[in-house]
């Protein structure tokens, strides 16, 4: 199990494939994605890596977090997240993960906080059909109707679909296809929409319901590894 990455949602656009078909994509940007800390079985009881992305002002960073980043020899980060990994995919502290961590055609799971819609009625929140527009209807056009039953059971069951706060929840969209990556600019283009507003931090992981492509880098797509491969290619030429 490899580590995921933290990316920032820039927005949506479209690209064209080899067949000339237009594909809607969401652009995710990775900015200075470094390994900040490790979690090991001996010390923590499980194996994981803590990643940090972005840049935070030193004056806005607490003294404890300054020491945490200094220990890893990385600049203060705007966002931290932890990813469980297998022991053979544990990464060293301080290394940078690039967009080449994913390959075109790979399936990924994307996690983000959905856009908040405020207090919404059942027609918007749960796609209810509503009531009649006329013919005896009295100000219940968009109402949900009955909520309970009779004396037995004499209550409203938990989970009843009703009006309430919509959005602003943690959402994971599974099996999204990676269309392409741009390591130089740190961009990942995925097919379709992902949860979250523009500028939101998104967690991208290998899909749990799809196999990992054979050409996916292990333990991760690292910045130093990319440079080494480029140097080796130039030397061979």
Swiss-Prot record:
Record keyword Nucleotide-binding present: no
A GO BP annotation: translation
Entry comment on modification after translation: Methylated by PrmB.
Molecular function terms, GO-annotated: rRNA binding; structural constituent of ribosome
Comp. bias (Polar residues): 135-150
Region listing for Disordered, in residue ranges: 133-155, 213-237
Keywords annotated in UniProt: Methylation, Ribonucleoprotein, Ribosomal protein, RNA-binding, rRNA-binding
Signal peptide (from-to): none
Modified positions (N5-methylglutamine) in chain numbering: 151
Record keyword Zinc present: no
InterPro entries in the record: Ribosomal_uL3, Ribosomal_uL3_bac/org-type, Ribosomal_uL3_CS, Transl_B-barrel_sf
Positions of disulphide bridges: none
Coiled coil: none
HAMAP family cross-referenced by the UniProt entry: Ribosomal_uL3_B
Stated family: Belongs to the universal ribosomal protein uL3 family.
UniProt-recorded name of the protein: Large ribosomal subunit protein uL3
Organism listed in the record: Brucella suis biovar 1 (strain 1330)
